[in-house]
Amino acid sequence: MSDKKTRVEKDSMGELRVPVAALYAAQTQRAVDNFPVSSLRLPKAFIQAIARIKKAAALVNMELGLLEPNLGKAIVDAAQKILDGKHDDHFPVDVFQTGSGTSTNMNVNEVIASLAAGRAGEKVSANDHVNMGQSSNDVIPAAIHVSAALETDRSLLPALEHLAEIIEKKAATLESVVKTGRTHLMDAMPVRMSQELGGWALQIRNGIDRIRAVLPRLHRLAQGGTAVGTGINAHPSFAARVAEVLEQETAVPFKPNASFFESLSAQDTAVELSGQLKVVAVSLIKIANDLRWMNSGPLAGLGEIELPALQPGSSIMPGKVNPVIPEATAMVAAQVIGNDATITVAGQSGSFQLNVMLPLIAYNLLQSIEILANVSRLLADKAITAFVVREDNLQVALARNPILVTALNPLIGYMKAAEIAKAAYKEGRPIVEVAAEMTGLSREELEKLLDPAVLTKGGIQE
C-alpha cells in the first residue's frame, strides 16, 4: 500500500500501516496480513453479537463507576452503529485465524474505539476502554452463544415451525388420497398420503423440540470469566449485570454460566446444538428424497406428484424440468452434516483452560442455522405447498399391487397369500381376480377386504 493510501497505527508490537479509510487499527491489520487463508469471514450475526456484548459491557462499567460516562456513552453509540449494520465492511479478518478469536475481538474493539473517539472528542482505547473487564477468551465464547441463540430464536425456529405447518396443512388436503406404500423401495401395503406427510411433519416437530431443549444451556454465557475463567480484572458484579443487560436488549434469558472454566475450555453446548441441527438435516434429506422419488418421471418414474416447474432443467434436453428445491434441500443438509463433523473436531480442541478453534465453531454453527432456516422456507413454499397429486397414476399402481393380499393372512394364512401374490405378479392381473380363483372368498368379500382405503386404517380384516 502506498503512503497516500495508508496511515500509521501503533500497537504493543510497534507501528504498522493501515488503509487510510479503515476504522480498524494495527491489530486487525496484523491479522489481515497474517491470515490470508480464505475468502471466508465471520458472519454478520457474530460480529453484531460481539458489538452487543461491548455495548452491554460499557453500560455496566459506567454503572459500576469504572468507565467515564463520556467514553462509555461514545462506546455504546459506536456499538449500536455496528448493530445497525452501518460498518459491515470494516471486519476483514479471516475465519482461519488465532483459535481464540482474539483477532476478531480486537477488530471489533478497534472499530468501536475509532467510532467512539469521534463522538467523545478524545482518544478511546480499544483495550483499556472498549475491552474493559473482558478478554477475547470470554467474549468469543459468549458471542457464539449469543449469536446462535438469537439466530435460532429469530430465524431457524420460525422457519421450521412454518415448514411443519405447511406440511400439516398439505396433509389435511390429502386425507382421502391413497397410494402404494413402499419399503426397501419395493411395493408394500397402501397408505394415505396424509399419513406419509404426517410422518414428515412429526420429524420436523421433533427437531424443533430437540433444538428448544438445548436453549437453556445456550443462554448460559462465558462473559465474566475473562482470561482463564477466574474473572481476573472484571468487577464481581460484571458478569451478572452484563447478562441482565443482554436479556433486556434481546428478550432472551441470558445468564452467567455456572462455571466459566467450562465456558472457556469447552464448547459442548455448541456441539450439542450442532448435533440437533444435524438431526434436522437428516430429516430434511428424507423428506427431499421422498419428494424426488414421488416426482420422478414424469413418464418412466413413479409419477405420484408433480412439483412446481421453477426453471429449465437442462442445457441440452429441451423441456426437462428437475426437482430443484428438494435438490437444494439435500445439499444444505449435506453441508450441515459436514459442519457438524467440523464442529465436533473443533469442540475437542480445548486444552486446559481454552478452546482454540472458536472462530471455526462460530462460522460453521451460524452457517448451519442460516442455511437450514432459509431452505426450510423454500421447501415449504416452493415445493410442498404447491405440489399436485397425480391420482390417476396412484390408482393404477394400487390396482396392480399384489401386496394387498397381506390383508388376507388372518383368513387364508401366509403361504396361501404368497401363492396368490406370486400368481398375480406373474400373470399381471389384479389381486382380487386371482384371489377369487384361488380362495373360497367371493369377489364382493375380496373387494371389501382388499379396499386400499380401508387397509390404511390398520387392524385385522374380517
Which residues are covered by each model-predicted region?
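Conserved, well-structured ligand/cofactor-binding cores
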Residues: M1-E462
